[in-house]
A protein has these predicted regions:
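Positively charged, low-complexity intrinsically disordered leader regions
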Residues: 1-26
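Short beta-strand segments enriched in small/hydrophobic residues
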Residues: 27-37
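Short beta-strand segments
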Residues: 34, 90-94, 162, 203
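Short beta->alpha junction loops
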Residues: 36, 60-70, 188-189
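Glycine-rich phosphate/diphosphate-binding loop of Rossmann-like nucleotide-binding domains
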Residues: 41-49, 132-224, 229, 233-250
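Short, well-structured alpha-helical segments in soluble
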Residues: 72-84
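Anion-binding alpha/beta catalytic cores of soluble intermediary-metabolism enzymes, centered on
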Residues: 90-154, 208
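Rossmann-fold NAD(P)-binding glycine/threonine-rich loop
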Residues: 104-123, 223-278
Length: 281
């Protein structure tokens, strides 16, 4: 019990990606589309490009102006997706508020939707289709749980998820249910506590909203948020140091170097999956 070593899990995932890439005759390509100049997005894109290149995955990054209109943005994304050499396509979020995010995402074909955010991929995930592409953060949470359980079957676990977003809560509920977990999905309007949960997953996006008094012995806490505290330091929803100080029998992810580093690794898994779904060898 204690701090979950997400760095070790990340290395295991990346080694899996390397093994899959070594068996391929061709080279998968990831195409990242960015609209505007969001500072956080620049950091995330840089990390994705760095990780992909280290693995030997081709990467193309296309930066679009923040004043681009909806129609032109859709046309650009469609043109990128129509190129057979682009196997995995992602729209880096957030995008400027005048654009319709859902329309842009759904331009991407299911088999190239490396982020797993199209309506079709979400429906396939809910229906437990093996060719569904799972959003990377949700997959990262699952990778933690299946390694801790040493089994893909999660029928032993009751999970409380505090997030209902398209990126985390909704796909995670479907993914964990597909692996036989019992999942309770909460949000800002819910009246909830964590009593009875074996696993708590948080993603509310508020620095240090949870402390040791919110949790119980024997639980696993997975913090999916990346916030900044009053001093400008990166932190999660949970004050993990306070939790570890007051509860001995508990597992918890750190922030930083927690779920965030698994997200990029799982995205690389999805790049290979996209390539294979298109008949790549």
């Amino acid at each position: 019990m204690g701090l979950i070593d997400c760095k070790a899990i990340r290395e295991e995932i990346l080694n899996d990606v390397k093994s899959q890439l070594a068996e391929l005759k061709g080279t998968p390509r990831l195409c990242i589309v960015t609209i505007g100049n969001d500072d956080a997005s620049k950091v995330y894109v840089r990390n994705k490009i760095k990780t992909a290149k280290e693995l030997g995955i081709d990467v193309q990054h296309l930066q679009l102006d923040d004043d681009i209109c909806q129609e032109e943005a859709e046309q650009v994304i469609e043109a990128i997706c129509n190129r057979s050499t682009n196997h995995a396509v992602m729209l880096q979020l957030p995008i400027p508020s005048h654009l319709n995010k859902d329309r842009l995402l759904n331009v991407i074909p299911q088999h190239k939707d490396v982020d797993g955010l199209t309506d079709l991929n979400m429906g396939m995930l809910v229906n437990n289709r093996q060719d569904a592409i799972v959003p990377a953060t949700a997959q990262g949470v699952y990778e933690i749980l299946r390694r801790m359980n040493r089994n893909d079957d999660l029928s032993w676990v009751n999970v409380t998820v505090v997030n209902r977003s398209q990126l985390i809560g909704k796909p995670l509920q479907a993914l964990l249910t597909n692996h036989n977990a019992t999942v309770t999905l909460c949000h800002s309007k819910s009246d909830y506590d964590f009593d009875g949960a074996d696993v708590v997953v948080t993603g509310i996006g508020h620095a240090h909203s949870y402390y040791s008094e919110d949790f119980f012995d024997g639980q696993t806490i997975i913090d999916c948020s990346m916030n900044r505290n009053e001093d400008g330091h990166l932190c999660g929803d949970v004050n993990y140091k306070d939790v570890l100080t007051h509860i001995r029998d508990i597992d918890i992810t750190p922030v930083p170097s927690g779920v965030g580093i698994l997200t990029t690794a799982c995205l690389m898994l999805n790049v290979v999956k996209c390539y294979l779904l298109q008949g790549g060898e």
